[in-house]
Amino acid sequence: MIHYSRAAPNRAAGAVLDNRAMPRLCAFYGIIIYMYRPDHPPPHFHAEYGEFVAQIELGSLEVLNGSLPPRTLRLVREWARLHPDELAENWALAQALEPLVPIDPLA
């Protein structure tokens, strides 16, 4: 099982996340979304739900590594489809070791 340390909670829209190695971009319905700084290609984010952890590729939204329960994966993909530009921008910031910007949760 993979365990990641918890990063700081999301802040108000327009805020910038601190310089932790794996800042938390978003949290909703018990799902936590992270992005490493920097990380290996292809561009992706990490989703954690309880004991489950998965790497999700940007664009295709395919699971690269790990797993999530089916309902959780559907919610993560629904959220990611709403925020492709923000995810891509955060990936670029992460690779440049710049602070990341939080993304709104799934409502």
For each predicted feature, which ranges?
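Basic nucleic-acid-binding interfaces
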Residues: M1-S5, P9-A107
